[in-house]
Amino acid sequence: LSRQQLADAMQRCYALRLGLAVHAIGDGAVRATLDARAQLHSAVRFNFVTHAGPFLRIEHCELIDTLDTPRFAAMNAVASVQPCHLLTDIEVLRRQLPHRLHRVLPLRELIDNGCAPGELLWFGSDVPIVPADPADSLTAATVRGRSGTPRDSAIAPEQSLTLQECYLAFAAGR
């Protein structure tokens, strides 16, 4: 979709009082989605919610630019993340994006910028793409690698969450 098509879809969803979920894995797609939401702001307050929660939910959010993490809370947009993808993608990330590893799943940064776990930071499973094992996402979010990964080998360990934060992200907001 073009940015204008995305903005038009958001406008239609708003007119019907429907929430919108957008799949955006990389930082370009995340930014385009947030930009489309900002374009709609003149007509729709950011605090508009549907019966299912905030108006906009962005699925995956595996790479987010530093400039965009504060925009989630400012726009009342949900970052719906599946941390388990870190475990399945770890070799590809190291091989293809070694210079961008610090931007992979910036979970701590989202929280620090106002995305409270269970409110604007949600975790999900992404079944059937990955196995239905929440332990994988707990490991990925807390260890930032596979079980037993030393901290100095973790991907962006400064983005680690506590188990309590993970439980909140899994349990609330749905």
Q: Over which residues does each language-model region extend?
A:
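Well-ordered alpha-helical segments embedded in enzymatic catalytic cores
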Residues: 5-9
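His/Asp/Glu-enriched, well-ordered alpha-helical/loop segment
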Residues: 11-21, 28-56, 60-61, 66-77, ...
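Active-site-adjacent "gating/activation" loops or surface patches in catalytic cores
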Residues: 1
